[in-house]
């Protein structure tokens, strides 16, 4: 007979950011434990609130499944003596398995005969196994742990109660001097201590005590309440999914309420108000026809009793926040950009890389060199120079000091206020983009250039002085910034290689008297290459194709992506296989070529090598122009024209001919062909055969 099982871990309030992952761990580890222990069940459901993590297993079998297990013994030559009798080794083996020599069978493994027995393993009663569940609870990991009292266990928050039940029976075990029972606790203020009669009653029992244990149910309830408020008040309440998930993990029984603030605060930039509401107070901002309104929606952890009082209390808290923001805003606007720029000279960016003022000066030089490479118009270059020059001034403002997440956004607002060109102001905002993998890219070429210059300065500078990310440690966010640069290069389709960018940055650092460590150039190239590999994998491209186009040289990021896509498509084209094989024949031989000889037409001896050389000359200029203009599809098609002549050449000629001049001439031809193929991709790295 199957029975339901419930495990609940009662805790002091967990940080919201830990809850989803902890619940997932509990669910996954439970499923894994059931599978490993051969325990059947109908379903597994996990729960989480700020004060509890729980898992419910429906219709868990009362006994493990019994199995028949084959056990390998010694080799037959050891198990039997010369007379064919079982030796002590065989007898000891079977006895150890609780069997006799009558149960032995012989099987051959890799040409050697071994003795085997089939052992019946009876399933254990579930009551014997369930106390092992303690190890699952103890194995849950969190972003940060703590100890409490004299306990040795480390956990996100102290464990205050444990529920462990199979049917109406308590499963006995203890963690941190807390013993399991069938008693749980409702809402901290509205609920009470309650005894669970059966695991299946868990959800209802807690709901009756003002706890909604399913996170998704709380989320749905919040969304429904927001929709109701929209209808009642004519509001628009944009639902930020990240904020919604955080709020649902802050409450056990959500009740939404409307608060308001003075309209005068709407004079403050809306980004400041929204940040204050969302990031600091976890409120949902309210709009009408896309315009921010002097209202907000909060979510209470409780019912609607005295909800008006709750709203007023929250209004008071927000009012204090907004009063501070208004003060900072007005104070900042009484200053000037030069005032804030001067402060940058006193703030260290990195000990070996100087102040923020030093960084800005390098950014200007890097941005100007990039602009030159891109042949940008003179007016755009002037805007880029100014944007780079004042890109960091807002870091010194009171507003950004209070709302650090608004750096760039405040820079744009203030730059406009202080009379800067709108393109300059926009670039100040955009140069921080993208801040993360899902963030928007800069919308203008000016913003893109300044963004790349900023991030390139940070990456090259840190690696130049030995601050290379290791493992999960990346305090300067270099990996994220490298990915951001690659995304911008791909999006803008600039005819600019990563190697050229690195050369620009290191040249600027050398002229700025920054001591650069040995092999910095190589480390930077490899650092960017690994980020490109990561991004290409994220786009669903195969690893071997990625390495084929990036291992030689990362080069132009957009072109590398396009080549990888083209080669990935060709993997599924049967007609491309002989083309790939021909090009690889050339590359395989090129490893053995050590010659700087030029091809001599008078030493082309056979018809097939003359045809190959002629075809090489025919396509060379066209192919190189196609690569130069990033025409990857056409370039590969042009390269494919060499396939038939290459096969004929290898089939009809001995490359390593006895005649040294003939040999060197053929090797020179191989080198020339290699110099065409490798700039596209090292096709040797692609495992084509697995596709056909």
UniProtKB/Swiss-Prot annotation:
It comes from the Bacteria. Its EC number is 6.1.1.14. GO terms for biological process: arginyl-tRNA aminoacylation; glycyl-tRNA aminoacylation. GO terms for molecular function: arginine-tRNA ligase activity; ATP binding; glycine-tRNA ligase activity. It catalyses: tRNA(Gly) + glycine + ATP = glycyl-tRNA(Gly) + AMP + diphosphate. It is found in: Cytoplasm. Disulfide bonds: none annotated. Its main location: cytoplasm. SUPFAM superfamilies: HD-domain/PDEase-like. GO terms for cellular component: cytosol. It holds the Pfam family tRNA_synt_2f. It is an enzyme of class 6 (ligase). InterPro entries: DALR_anticod-bd, Gly-tRNA-synth_bsu, Gly-tRNA-synth_heterodimer. Keywords: Aminoacyl-tRNA synthetase, ATP-binding, Cytoplasm, Ligase, Nucleotide-binding, Protein biosynthesis. Tetramer of two alpha and two beta subunits. Belongs to the class-II aminoacyl-tRNA synthetase family. This is Glycine--tRNA ligase beta subunit. The gene is glyS.
């Amino acid at each position: 007979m199957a029975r339901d099982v419930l495990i609940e871990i009662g805790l002091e309030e967990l940080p919201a950011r830990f809850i989803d992952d902890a619940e997932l761990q509990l669910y996954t580890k439970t499923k894994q434990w059931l599978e490993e222990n051969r325990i059947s069940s109908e379903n597994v459901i996990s729960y989480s609130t700020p004060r509890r993590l729980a898992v419910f297993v429906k219709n868990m079998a009362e006994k493990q499944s019994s199995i028949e297990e084959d056990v390998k013994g010694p080799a037959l030559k050891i198990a039997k003596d010369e007379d064919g009798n079982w030796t002590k080794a065989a007898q000891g083996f079977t006895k150890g398995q609780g069997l006799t020599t009558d149960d032995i069978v012989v099987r051959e493994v890799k040409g050697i005969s071994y003795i085997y027995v089939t052992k019946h393993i009876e399933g254990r009663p579930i009551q014997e196994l369930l106390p092992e569940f303690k190890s699952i609870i103890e194995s849950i990991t969190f972003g940060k742990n703590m100890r409490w009292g004299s306990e040795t266990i480390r956990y996100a928050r102290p464990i205050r109660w444990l529920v462990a039940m199979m049917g109406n029976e308590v499963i006995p075990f203890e963690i941190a001097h807390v013993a399991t029972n069938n008693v749980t606790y409702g809402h901290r203020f509205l609920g009470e201590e309650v005894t669970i009669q059966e695991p299946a009653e868990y959800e209802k029992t807690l709901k009756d005590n003002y706890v909604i244990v399913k996170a998704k149910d709380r989320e749905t309830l919040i969304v429904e309440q927001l929709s109701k408020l929209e209808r009642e008040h004519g509001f628009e309440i944009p639902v930020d999914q990240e904020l919604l998930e955080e709020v649902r993990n802050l409450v056990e029984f959500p009740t939404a309420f409307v608060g308001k603030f003075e309209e005068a605060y709407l004079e403050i930039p809306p980004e400041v108000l929204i940040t204050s509401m969302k990031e600091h107070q976890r409120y949902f901002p309210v709009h009408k026809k896309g315009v921010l309104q002097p209202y907000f929606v909060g979510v209470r952890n409780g019912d609607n009793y005295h909800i008006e009082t709750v709203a007023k209390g929250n209004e008071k808290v927000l009012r204090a926040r907004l009063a501070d923001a208004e003060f900072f805003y007005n104070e900042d606007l009484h200053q000037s950009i030069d005032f804030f720029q001067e402060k940058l000279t006193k703030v260290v960016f990195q000990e070996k890389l100087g102040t923020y003022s030093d960084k800005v000066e390098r950014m200007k030089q890097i941005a100007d060199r990039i602009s030159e490479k891109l042949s940008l118009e003179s007016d755009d270059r002037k805007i880029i120079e100014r944007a780079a020059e004042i890109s960091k001034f807002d870091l010194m403002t009171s507003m950004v000091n209070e709302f650090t997440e608004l750096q760039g956004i405040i820079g744009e607002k203030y730059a406009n206020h202080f009379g800067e060109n709108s393109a300059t102001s926009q670039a100040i905002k955009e140069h921080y983009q993208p801040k993360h993998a899902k963030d928007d890219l800069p919308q203008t070429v000016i913003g893109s250039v300044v963004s790349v210059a900023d991030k390139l300065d940070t990456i090259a500078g840190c690696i130049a002085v030995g601050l290379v990310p290791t493992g999960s440690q990346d305090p300067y966010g270099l990996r994220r910034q490298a990915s951001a640069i690659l995304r911008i290069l791909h999006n803008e389709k600039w005819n600019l290689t990563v190697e050229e960018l690195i050369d620009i940055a290191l040249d600027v650092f050398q002229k700025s008297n920054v001591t650069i460590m040995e092999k910095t150039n190589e480390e930077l190239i490899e650092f960017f290459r690994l980020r490109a590999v990561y991004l290409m994998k994220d786009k669903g491209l195969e690893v071997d194709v990625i390495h084929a186009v990036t291992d030689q040289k990362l080069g132009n990021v957009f072109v590398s992506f396009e080549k990888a896509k083209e080669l990935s498509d060709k993997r599924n084209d049967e007609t491309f296989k002989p083309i790939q094989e021909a090009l690889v024949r050339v590359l395989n031989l090129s490893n053995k070529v050590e010659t700087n000889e030029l091809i001599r037409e008078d030493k082309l001896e056979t018809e097939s090598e003359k045809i190959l050389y002629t075809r090489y000359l025919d396509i060379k200029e066209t192919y190189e122009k196609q690569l130069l203009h990033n025409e990857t599809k056409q370039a590969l098609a042009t390269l494919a024209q060499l396939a038939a002549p290459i096969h004929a050449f290898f089939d009809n000629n001995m490359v390593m001919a006895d005649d040294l001049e003939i040999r060197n001439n053929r090797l020179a031809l191989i080198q020339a062909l290699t110099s065409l193929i490798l700039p596209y991709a090292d096709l040797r790295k692609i495992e084509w055969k697995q596709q056909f």
